[in-house]
């Protein structure tokens, strides 16, 4: 059981550690001026949006931008803290912040995936997932950002490794 718990902690560590450059170099391109990024990163984003038909990153609507602002303001500062906690392992103090984080992220990614699967996209949009295959391919890009937070939430809620033991007062 301890090996399984430690494996999960390593998964969470790599998730949070890798999320720092992904957020800074990729995700924030949706809200920051292009002048802040080198041309190679702008070209990479253009290739990605065309190849995977990600209209949310190509032409982000206001609701999606609000999610990216939350990622920048609320989540990004949490990434190194969480990476440290899971690298170290067994840090009970990460439980409540991880529950808040995972519930928040799962909620936003469910909205994104729902939009991708069920949204109506005008045929005039050059970049949009118009076929079922396009939609499922794009969902597969976003899915890990739902699955790992849900796994984190379940771990924090049900793993005895992270439960705080209550101190009872003697009478």
From Swiss-Prot:
Membrane topology term: Multi-pass membrane protein
Site (Important for 20(S)-OHC binding and stereoselectivity): 145
Location in or out of the cell: Rough endoplasmic reticulum membrane; Nucleus membrane
Biological-process GO terms, alphabetical: cholesterol homeostasis; positive regulation of lipoprotein transport; regulation of intracellular cholesterol transport; regulation of intracellular lipid transport
Annotated site residues (Likely important for receptor folding) in this chain: 54
Pfam families named in the record: EBP
Segments on the Cytoplasmic side according to the record's topology features: 1-6, 88-97, 159-171
GO cellular component: lysosome; nuclear membrane; plasma membrane; rough endoplasmic reticulum; rough endoplasmic reticulum membrane
Stretches in topological domain Lumenal: 28-66, 119-137
Keywords, comma-separated and alphabetical: Endoplasmic reticulum, Membrane, Nucleus, Transmembrane, Transmembrane helix
Residues the record lists as binding cholesterol: 73, 75
Top-level taxon: Eukaryota
Chief place of localization: endoplasmic reticulum
Residue numbers covered by motif ER retention motif: 167-171
One Gene Ontology molecular-function label: cholesterol binding
Domain EXPERA residues, every copy: 8-153
Transmembrane segments: 7-27, 67-87, 98-118, 138-158
Other noteworthy facts: Sigma receptors are classified into two subtypes (Sigma-1 and Sigma-2) based on their different pharmacological profile. Sigma-2 receptors are identified by radioligand-binding studies as a binding site with high affinity for di-o-tolylguanidine (DTG) and haloperidol.
Domain-level remarks: The EXPERA domain doesn't possess any sterol isomerase catalytic activity.
Family affiliation: Belongs to the TMEM97/sigma-2 receptor family.
Function: Sigma-2 receptor which contributes to ameliorate dysfunctional cellular processes and slow degenerative progression by regulating cell functions including cholesterol biosynthesis/trafficking, membrane trafficking, autophagy, lipid membrane-bound protein trafficking, and receptor stabilization at the cell surface. Forms a ternary complex with PGRMC1 receptor and low density lipoprotein receptor/LDLR at the plasma membrane, which increases LDLR-mediated LDL cholesterol internalization.
Quaternary organization: Homodimer.
Record-given protein name: Sigma intracellular receptor 2
Originating organism: Xenopus tropicalis
């Amino acid at each position: 059981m301890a090996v399984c718990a430690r494996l999960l902690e390593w998964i969470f560590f790599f998730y949070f550690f890798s999320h720092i450059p992904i957020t800074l170099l990729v995700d924030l391109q949706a809200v920051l001026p292009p002048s802040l990024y080198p041309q190679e990163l702008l070209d990479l984003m253009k290739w990605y949006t065309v190849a995977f038909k990600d209209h949310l990153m190509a032409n982000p609507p206001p609701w999606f931008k609000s999610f990216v602002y939350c990622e920048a303001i609320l989540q990004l500062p949490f990434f190194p803290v969480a990476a440290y906690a899971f690298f170290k392992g067994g840090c009970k103090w990460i439980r409540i912040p991880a529950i808040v984080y995972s519930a928040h992220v799962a909620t936003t990614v469910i909205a994104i995936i729902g939009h991708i699967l069920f949204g109506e996209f005008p045929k005039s949009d050059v970049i949009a997932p118009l076929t079922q295959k396009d939609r499922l391919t794009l969902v597969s890009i976003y899915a890990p950002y739902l699955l790992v937070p849900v796994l984190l939430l379940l771990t924090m809620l049900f793993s005895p490794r992270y439960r705080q033991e209550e101190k009872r007062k003697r009478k």
